[in-house]
């Protein structure tokens, strides 16, 4: 079914609306998105929770969390809506059941070195969109070949992570055009560089997210981006890959990964603004999560 693209929206809003699948009673559980979150350790249980709940609130039907055994009980207790696997290894075997994957939130940096290539190779074999964030970016910095040349990979570095990754891949400090340069050097993966202005590039094109955000910088906001982004990536690639859909013609200028990154950036920025209007300095990521429904309806009125 062709997505509804509402009139009166900005060009960026229309771009994202064109890949969002319409809701209808004919769909079965799981068809709107099954997302996997690979992350969670003894110290960090909140990060995978926020990523997972962002995916659910954005519209995913099912979300699996694959975490260290020490994190599983806490994450299970946070929400009964999440399917929690108390082992990272389960992520590899469950990939055929998923539509998109997030690697990194709260993962920690002591994962066995040989396991990461196995995970990313299987993701490539399945053709799954993969969002790499937080500790996942640490492993990509150590081994850029994990994502090199994979067009369905989306990296979401903050300023510090971008600096480290750029130096590791290009061997010099970041320059003014660091985002498209990094994307090209990694074989045209998509990079969503988070900052005062979110910059998105696949090395061919560049988008700037102009949506106003929040001055509050509480922990967990990046996890909200990565979780919602995984679902947007599934939707966008599905729209792009479906023959005959109008969205495929409309989105020819920008690749599906870039459109997905734009959607997630806009959504979380609007959530931050709405939450800050209510909570000011007390704003937490949980407050932003509570604004997903309102922000989505305001930005992407497709239903």
Swiss-Prot record:
The organism of origin for this protein: Ixodes scapularis (Black-legged tick)
Cofactor: Mg(2+)
GO biological process: metabolite repair; nicotinamide nucleotide metabolic process
Record-linked Pfam families: Carb_kinase
Binding site for ATP: 194-198, 213-222
GO MF annotation list: ATP binding; ATP-dependent NAD(P)H-hydrate dehydratase activity
The EC number(s) this enzyme carries: 4.2.1.93
Extent of the signal sequence: none
CDD domains reported in the protein's UniProt record: YXKO-related (cd01171)
Keywords of the record: ATP-binding, Lyase, NAD, NADP, Nucleotide-binding, Phosphoprotein
Family of the protein in this entry: Belongs to the NnrD/CARKD family.
UniProt name for this protein: ATP-dependent (S)-NAD(P)H-hydrate dehydratase
SUPFAM superfamilies registered for this protein in UniProt: Ribokinase-like
InterPro entries: Carbohydrate_kinase_pred_CS (IPR017953), CARKD (IPR000631), Ribokinase-like (IPR029056)
Record-annotated YjeF C-terminal domain positions: 12-299
Positions with a binding annotation for (6S)-NADPHX: 106, 158-164, 223
Superkingdom, taxonomy of origin: Eukaryota
Role, per record: Catalyzes the dehydration of the S-form of NAD(P)HX at the expense of ATP, which is converted to ADP. Together with NAD(P)HX epimerase, which catalyzes the epimerization of the S- and R-forms, the enzyme allows the repair of both epimers of NAD(P)HX, a damaged form of NAD(P)H that is a result of enzymatic or heat-dependent hydration.
Lineage: Eukaryota, Metazoa, Ecdysozoa, Arthropoda, Chelicerata
Catalysis performed (reactions): (6S)-NADHX + ATP = ADP + phosphate + NADH + H(+); (6S)-NADPHX + ATP = ADP + phosphate + NADPH + H(+)
